[in-house]
Regions:
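Catalytic-core loop-and-flanking beta/alpha module that positions acidic residues
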Residues: 1-159
Length: 159
């Protein structure tokens, strides 16, 4: 099984701290409207009870076992609901389906990049490298800024 995680927002101070090396990293905005396998892109379900799959589930595999495992990949504790997460979940069967040519081409995701957002603390060298990399593309580059009036982030376009 392969899982890729995405969020509906790029303005969460907490997520920049957790997932972008304390605001030194970056966030990528994708446009998945033309994604071939978007039926596998689902919102995460935030719940207070754990979604249960027995530890010895391999002993109980049935034709529907794949669905149970797939479904389990879409659950997360309600504590994380601020993430507004979506997951692209592909099973081994999906990955070998002829429609996907043996496996999902990871590099093809580049075609869906709309923008790159640099963290508040991203270095100037990192900014230069990102701007150089996307110079001849339609990808927009932004730097996140902390609001002076409240606890929020705003994106300022730099390229």
């Amino acid at each position: 099984m392969r899982v890729a995680c995405f969020s509906e927002t790029n303005r969460s101070i907490l997520m920049w701290s957790h997932y972008a090396h304390n605001h030194q990293g970056f966030c990528i905005e994708y446009d998945f409207s033309q994604l071939e396998y978007k039926q596998h892109l689902k919102p995460v379900r935030y719940v207070s009870e754990r979604h249960y799959i027995p530890g010895d589930f391999a002993d109980h595999i049935s034709p529907n076992a794949g669905n149970a495992i797939y479904e389990a990949a879409l659950y997360k504790s309600a504590e994380w609901s601020y993430e507004k997460e979506w997951r692209l979940v592909m099973s081994k069967i999906d990955l070998t389906h002829p429609e996907y040519s043996e496996r999902i081409p990871v590099m093809a995701v580049n075609a869906f990049i709309r923008a790159v957002y640099l963290g508040v603390k991203a270095s100037k060298d990192f900014e230069k490298a990102i701007c150089t990399h996307y110079k001849e593309t339609p990808v927009k580059i932004y730097r996140m800024k902390l609001s002076a009036s409240n606890y929020s982030l705003q994106a300022e376009q730099i390229q």
